[in-house]
Amino acid sequence: AVSCFKACMKKRGIPFVCSVDC
């Protein structure tokens, strides 16, 4: 989950959106 979140952060940079995606 953490690695997914970090990867999403690099793509979008929006934490709450990353949480929904993951």
Swiss-Prot record:
Expressed by the venom gland. GO terms for cellular component: extracellular region. This is 2.39 kDa venom peptide. Keywords: Disulfide bond, Secreted. Not lethal to mice by intraperitoneal or intracerebroventricular injections in doses up to 100 micrograms. Contains 2 disulfide bonds. It comes from the Eukaryota. The keyword Cytoplasm does not apply. It comes from Heterometrus spinifer. The lineage of its organism: Eukaryota, Metazoa, Ecdysozoa, Arthropoda, Chelicerata. It is found in: Secreted.
